A protein has these predicted regions:
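N-terminal leader/linker segments that precede catalytic domains of diphosphate-processing enzymes
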Residues: 2-337
Length: 337
């Protein structure tokens, strides 16, 4: 797209955003459950760089949007684990936050990213990361819904679906030690705490072997039926670092234990979705908008089964929006495909 065409398109976006503000359906926030057809807007005032780039984008500054990198993130959930629920907050001077005594019906496993990370440093996130070329190219032993079935659900190609599902399972293994796999036919629970598992986990994380090679050597199959699609978020075109991220929900498999032994995080904990949101509101945890939205989607769940059965939020592809008052936010209509 030429520079002049880009400016024209963005000028039209600004005009439509402002002129159509009163004509839109109700504007939702990311603190409300999303669904296809909803219109959502959210502030990014806590991220001055994002606001600055969004203003420049709407003003028609020269910008060739970068292609977003495919990524996968997994909300690993379990019944409440009060004895594991602890985070130290860098926003509260590093002091441990008081544990909750009463167990919540659902906890989610989260990691606090290292302050040295280029992307979302110090943020509390779910396990996940970018899709690797070998996630697509390497044959992965498979059980559960096929890549073709996932592709229809995810609105992507079959190779992309295979790669994204593989990346989701691989990232969970690398960052939490949990293996969304089993012997063919779903045999006895896997105990992943042995030294040999730690060595192979490190080998996968450092790309010495692919996740598919690891599964084949162990006689295991990836269990795509252990994952449920939650939402799909794409970073706005105004950003230089963009991700095309599918969020999944997975139950903690019987007999397995999540940890945070990854170089990308400084701590890990099980925490109730509502508790994470309350700590964010209190300025004790840093959460980014997609994380806030996905936590909100299961905050009312009274059981792991209820969280599992929560409907798909939809595809969220936000773009800069200039409100009539002059505030710049991000927003979009949530789509079904």
């Amino acid at each position: 797209m030429s520079e002049s065409a880009g400016k024209t398109r963005r000028a039209a976006e600004v005009a439509a955003n402002v002129a159509g503000a009163t004509e839109r359906r109700r504007v939702q926030s990311i603190r409300e459950p999303l669904s296809p057809g909803a219109y959502v807007e959210y502030s990014v005032d806590d991220q001055p760089g994002v606001v600055e780039r969004a203003r420049a984008y709407l003003a028609g500054a020269p910008c060739e949007p970068v292609a977003p990198r495919r990524a996968a993130t997994v909300m690993l959930v379990s019944e409440g684990k009060p004895h594991y629920r602890r985070f130290e907050s860098p926003l509260a001077g590093g002091a441990p936050i008081e544990e909750t005594v009463d167990a919540a019906p659902v906890d989610v496993f989260m990691l606090r990213r290292a302050s040295t990370m280029a992307f979302t440093p110090d943020a509390v996130v779910f396990p996940g990361g970018g899709m690797d070329a070998r996630d697509v190219e390497c044959a992965v032993p498979w059980a559960g819904p096929s890549p073709e079935q996932w592709a229809r659900l995810m609105s992507c190609t079959e190779p992309e679906a295979r790669g994204i599902i593989t990346a989701a399972a691989r990232e969970v293994f690398e960052e939490s030690g949990v293996l969304l796999a089993s012997a063919p036919g779903g045999a006895a629970p896997i105990d992943e705490r042995g030294a040999h598992w730690a060595c192979e986990r490190e080998a996968v994380a450092t790309r010495q072997i692919s996740f598919g090679e690891f599964l084949r050597e162990r006689g295991l199959v990836l269990r795509s039926d252990l994952m449920r699609l939650r939402s799909h978020w794409v970073t706005p075109e105004s950003e230089a670092r963009r991700y095309d991220t599918y969020f999944f929900l997975a139950r903690l498999p019987e007999g397995q234990h999540a940890d945070g032994r990854t170089s990308e995080a400084v701590e890990a904990a099980w925490i109730a979705p509502g508790e994470a949101l309350m700590r964010f509101d209190a300025g004790l945890l840093k959460l980014v908008p997609p994380t806030i939205s996905n936590l909100t989607s299961i905050v009312a769940a009274t059981s792991v089964d209820e969280a599992w059965n929560t409907p798909f939020d939809g595809h969220v592809r936000p773009h800069p929006v200039a409100r009539a008052c002059g505030e710049v936010v991000l927003g979009c209509e949530v789509s079904e495909t």
